Amino acid sequence: MKVRSSIKSLKNRHRDCQVVKRRGRVYVINKTDPRFKARAG
C-alpha cells in the first residue's frame, strides 16, 4: 500500500480505483487489481 499526501493522482492510475473514507483516513481501493491500494496522510 502506498502512502501519499495527495490522493488525486493515485485514483487516476486505474479505472477501477475507488476513493473510500475509513476511520478518518482516505483510502484508494481497487478490487480487480489490489496493487493500486493507497492511503492519504
From Swiss-Prot:
Keyword Ribosomal protein set for record: yes
Keyword Ribosomal protein (UniProt): yes
GO molecular function annotations of the record: structural constituent of ribosome
GO biological process, one term: translation
Keywords for this protein: Ribonucleoprotein, Ribosomal protein
InterPro entries: Ribosomal_bL36, Ribosomal_bL36_sp, Ribosomal_L36_bact
One of the record's GO cellular component terms: ribosome
PANTHER family: 50S RIBOSOMAL PROTEIN L36 2, LARGE RIBOSOMAL SUBUNIT PROTEIN BL36B
NCBIfam families: PRK00831.1, rpmJ_bact
Family, similarity comment: Belongs to the bacterial ribosomal protein bL36 family.
Name of the protein: Large ribosomal subunit protein bL36
Organism: Maricaulis maris (strain MCS10) (Caulobacter maris)
Name of the gene this protein is made from: rpmJ
